[in-house]
Amino acid sequence: MATANFGKIQIGIYVEIKRSDGRIHQAMVTSLNEDNESVTVEWIENGDTKGKEIDLESIFSLNPDLVPDEDIEPSPEIPPPSSSSKVNKIVKNRRTVASIKNDPPPRDNRVVGSARARPSQLPEQSSSAQQNGSVSDISPVQAAKKEFGPPSRRKSNCVKEVEKLQEKREKRRLQQQELREKRAQDVDATNPNYEIMCMIRDFRGSLDYRPLTTADPIDEHRICVCVRKRPLNKKETQMKDLDVITIPSKDVVMVHEPKQKVDLTRYLENQTFRFDYAFDDSAPNEMVYRFTARPLVETIFERGMATCFAYGQTGSGKTHTMGGDCSGKNQDCSKGIYALAARDVFLMLKKPNYKKLELQVYATFFEIYSGKVFDLLNRKTKLRVLEDGKQQVQVVGLQEREVKCVEDVLKLIDIGNSCRTSGQTSANAHSSRSHAVFQIILRRKGKLHGKFSLIDLAGNERGADTSSADRQTRLEGAEINKSLLALKECIRALGRNKPHTPFRASKLTQVLRDSFIGENSRTCMIATISPGMASCENTLNTLRYANRVKELTVDPTAAGDVRPIMHHPPSQIDDLETQWGVGSSPQRDDLKLLCEQNEEEVSPQLFTFHEAVSQMVEMEEQVVEDHRAVFQESIRWIEDEKALLEMTEEVDYDVDSYATQLEAILEQKIDILTELRDKVKSFRAALQEEEQASKQINPKRPRAL
């Protein structure tokens, strides 16, 4: 039972307490401290147990029902705020409506009061009672208490330190408030989005920030999806663009999307996404690598296949993340994930359990541009991707360079980056137009032991974010959209252990086939986003794509929710085949599978366009290959014809033999050239079909991302 000094306070009950920032919430009493007349309370906040020592006056001022019966109740204070303001919650799609433009934010005007209650109002209450003519039956002792206040109590050192810190905090907050008001006055006249900026600032002020740190544990994921935010660049700062991305914790990303009502009132649509990791604009490449690609290095030493790729809008930081710091077309390769992964590979080779395996390290670097593969380490030679009888994908002619140290890897990366396809867009002066694939390969006695594929994807808005709309631009956009769609479905198949992986739908997934098949395969996706308000739509597209990828791996038991082809009745399958007009080749079957599983993103017209592009690319490769063969054959024809002409110089040459051989050469020429001409005609017809299909695409359909 509690003593008289503690009134009705007992261990185990819940009392209202006031935090140093002004918040009031409940906490449980865990101990009663008679030596300094205080109580110790505990509460749970964000999953952590916190505690605090509070003097009795502060407890009684907020909990008058616990005051001892013989004591005078302290003056009532302002009632605690509603429960909605006690706990800061991150609410998805929460709207913040604009207030009066010149009103300062309510949070910044709040001055935190002292932790100890002041009974200065008691004499005023007494005099007020006397003026009203009321008679008071108060004992002399109680009158003394009322006149001079409660007797002074000794403060503990802990309370004194807290009060000092609180006083400094109050001064600092007042200074910051004055500085914010001064800045607000300066920005108000020039920034057209000042109203939105104030709403974002007020919303951020209500959040509890716990960003990712190097001390946080690294979780094991077969499929890891994370997001990285870059800071505002010089161009965005000059344009007075606003930062609309907030990362309050290690796995949450919030987008403050500005919107406008019918009555022109502006408000924020605060959308929340959750991933495995979220990196803010202060996170360096080393920290991103620590949580993403570094856990995958050991996988390749255990005879596994690992894949790490950067995905996002043009100019959002993909090449910076994978390749290193960029300055125009120059790049510091030593600070990218390519080099950091190579460094750890060579460190792992020195471990005793791996050193005895006598592994050799090789590296390849190639790019995929408009459905074609080019070797970046061999003067950008065009390569062919074929599938052998064992259903193994082979990149014919791809050079593997043996590397002995990190410096060798940096040289190869520098060679590859110097000849990678790039161009100017509205987002970046040097934008990557292709998917760049850098592979670290481990071989043991010539046989493949493990492979780590690091991919810098092209911009996900490439089909729309260029100044022209010619055929080359359409091919770039079609191939990028198709490859990203196929990549998502391959990750779906990997996460759910599906029997079929639609890797043939694009060149990117075709060359990465072995990374999506097998029990010891792991994948990491780094979605890079731009913070500016002008990039809000592309940022949301990137986050939704990454969110769909992660949703597929949250619940492995939800495999039945997927809509495979077998979910359609047989008659509906026939209708779909008629609607899509698909042939029976493996590539088209996989493309059809992608479109049927993503009907909300891919319209029948868009599928027809993708099919026309695929057919055109296949025919282009065949025409070029046949033309090269005809050219080689023409050299032999010239030699044969030269021999025939030399034969006619003789006095008694055989005329019948000459005529027979010449006729044979001409017939062979006619047959081969006629066949080539027919293929060229078909190829030109395919070009026309592609152009017509591009005009039939419904612009209101979502992009196939």
Curated annotation (Swiss-Prot):
Main subcellular location: cytoplasm
UniProt-listed Gene3D superfamilies: Kinesin motor domain
GO cellular component: axon cytoplasm; centriolar subdistal appendage; centriole; centrosome; cytoplasm; dendrite; GABA-ergic synapse; kinesin complex
Domain of life: Eukaryota
Coiled coil: 153-186, 659-698
Modified residues (Phosphothreonine): 96
Residues carrying N6-acetyllysine: 101
Modified sites of kind Phosphoserine: 75, 99, 134, 139
Biased composition (Polar residues): 122-139
Keyword 4Fe-4S: no
Entry keyword Coiled coil: yes
GO biological process, one term: anterograde axonal transport
Residues annotated to bind ATP: 312-319
InterPro entries: KIF2A-like_N, Kinesin-like_fam, Kinesin_motor_CS, Kinesin_motor_dom, Kinesin_motor_dom_sf, P-loop_NTPase
Domain (Kinesin motor) ranges: 222-552
Region feature Disordered, mapped onto this chain: 65-185
Single GO MF annotation: protein serine/threonine kinase binding
Intracellular or extracellular location(s): Cytoplasm; Cytoplasm, Cytoskeleton, Microtubule organizing center, Centrosome; Cytoplasm, Cytoskeleton, Spindle pole; Cytoplasm, Cytoskeleton, Spindle
Family: Belongs to the TRAFAC class myosin-kinesin ATPase superfamily. Kinesin family. MCAK/KIF2 subfamily.
Function: Plus end-directed microtubule-dependent motor required for normal brain development. May regulate microtubule dynamics during axonal growth. Required for normal progression through mitosis. Required for normal congress of chromosomes at the metaphase plate. Required for normal spindle dynamics during mitosis. Promotes spindle turnover. Implicated in formation of bipolar mitotic spindles. Has microtubule depolymerization activity.
Protein name: Kinesin-like protein KIF2A
Gene behind the chain: Kif2a
